[in-house]
Amino acid sequence: VRVVVLALVAQVTLSQHWSYGWLPGGKRSVGELEATIKMMDTGGVVALPEETSAHVSERLRPYDVILKKWMPHK
């Protein structure tokens, strides 16, 4: 019985890995995610390449980039 308990404890302690800023299960805390989004959304204006549009600028937000990546037809 002791050997089984020791084996289970060793398995749990060796397999448990938490990265800094992450909760168990690979989930981030909401506050840190919100801070990351705010840091990404600096409000800067990004110029598009000249092949796409001549001197046209548009403001890119993180969710706009994600939408364009997953739904390019829109």
From Swiss-Prot:
Residues 1-15 form the signal peptide. InterPro entries: GnRH (IPR002012), Gonadoliberin (IPR019792). The modification Glycine amide is found at residue 25. Its main location: secreted. GO terms for molecular function: gonadotropin hormone-releasing hormone activity; gonadotropin-releasing hormone receptor binding. The keyword Glycoprotein does not apply. One of its GO terms (cellular component) is extracellular space. It is found in: Secreted. Keywords: Amidation, Cleavage on pair of basic residues, Hormone, Pyrrolidone carboxylic acid, Secreted, Signal. The modification Pyrrolidone carboxylic acid is found at residue 16. Stimulates the secretion of gonadotropins. Belongs to the GnRH family. This is Progonadoliberin-3. The gene is gnrh3.
